[in-house]
Amino acid sequence: MQQKEIKLQEEEENRILEYLKFREKKESPQSTKEKEYVTDAKKIKGTYTDFSKAISIGDGYILLQSEAQNQVEKLQKQTGIKYARIWNILSKEHCFSEKDGYNFRKLDQVLDFLLDHHLKPYLELGSKPSLFMYTPERSINIEETKTSVFDFATFSEIIQEVCVHLVNRYGVDELETWYFEYWNDPSLHSFEPDGEYYQRFDLLYQTMKRYSEEISVGGAGFILGYESMACKNIFEIWREREIHPDFLSFCSFQYIALIEEGERIGKKSIDSEYISNQMQIMKLIMQEAKFEIPELHIDEWNFTISNRNILNDSCEQGAYILKNCIDMNGQVDIMAYWHALDLYSDYYDTDTVLNGDSGLISRDGICKPSFYAFQFINRLCSKVLGKYENAIVTTNGRNHFVIACHNYKSLSSRYVFTDEDEIQLEDIEQYVEDIEPIKLNFTIQNVQNGKYLVKTYRVNRASGSVQDLWKNLDYSKGLMRDEVEYLKSSAIPSIEMKTIEVENGELCLTNNLEMQEIRLIDIQYQYNV
């Protein structure tokens, strides 16, 4: 057994050494894995929707900071995000005190900022804690004062006050385009038929519907893979009640629930189809409970809940996002990635340019591979010609084709047994199943003959990865302003342009992708005078 483990370790080390040799020569390793993707330009297979154009920001009042505003504005402009999910909007610190009453001025500033920058609010109205996570078992409640749950009488009063304020300030038509969610706080006992959660949800629902039946109110942020069995009981309770949510919301972090010594704990999962598989399980549970809700949201999703997992900063995260945005199209109505900005978890230990947080933009405003994954998704056309394991092929139906593709590598068993905040930068390759490149051959049939301009955008360890650029700076702490600006301007996708000519109605392209690489291929017919 020991000899077998030594042999496997040697094989793994040899693969890594081979990969590094190619990296030094600035070449791509030869692909041993090859896939053929053939589509027909005349056959539309489906639609790519805007379901993934949502982001969880966290505590809404972070948007009072100019730094956060600048980064969110950049995020919206370059990725096309449409919904911004925020919580703690009813915090005692910012808008309510039992002594002085209500003051919604700061809330108005937050909402005005979102609307001024073409973002629709997705409002979580519960008392959701702002947790700083090292691992699922180790967290810090950064601001305890914000998370106390109002008693029912106070909650009832403040909900009615804030709802009438929003209607008067923004109008019913505007509020019909927002989402209002109420979180399943464990202290409200939704697993009991007379649990206070349902009373509070009904109050919020009835208050909003008083102004318009078209205002969307839902809940309750159930955790996929962790609360699945509890959900059957909750759905059966909810089914028997008069008021049902307009949408059900879920969180997806790649963990499964295990019972150890009588306690339920979360263990990391390496299922590469985790979100899709867990969502299918949840749909079956809904069917069994005879609780059919037409709209399903995943309002927080990531492979990790940790704010200190260096894979968040790596090319792995870009490939993970692109893969899941492709896979989940058509399965849910909204997916809001967790989360937007590293500023959310800016803490005493954030003394380096990257800290393993899951924001799309670093605290210094540097875009990560995860940011570019959403940028690539935003450029897809709406008509789908083909959806595959490693790619999606889209068109506008007028000689314009856009392909997004990836070489996502699943996490390895070694990842399962390593604390997330203990993964080292130099060991990243050891936490994926393999480091093999892939060759993707695309053929689009029945296209118009003539010349096409092909633009290829790449994000890999040589282009668009701030983590790998930082390596060239020796992972130094306390970078000077010009060094941060260098990273900011250099961590961008590479671009290649070429013209190809089609003579037989078939457009053929070959792409070799290294591990965790993502690409966007924009193909535009060139008309003659």
Task: Annotate each PLM feature.
Residues 41, 62-76, 165, 228-238, ...:
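Short, acidic/polar
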Residues 298-424:
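Aromatic/acidic polysaccharide-binding cleft in carbohydrate-active enzymes
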Residues 255-309, 333-342, 384:
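Glycoside hydrolase catalytic-domain groove-lining segments
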Residues 478-529:
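C-terminal beta-strand-rich structural cap/linker in extracellular carbohydrate-active enzymes
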Residues 1-81, 515, 527-529:
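Mature N-terminal, pre-catalytic/accessory segment of carbohydrate-active enzymes
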Residues 390-472, 513-522:
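Carbohydrate-binding surface patches
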Residues 54, 114, 162, 180, ...:
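Conserved, mostly hydrophobic/aromatic
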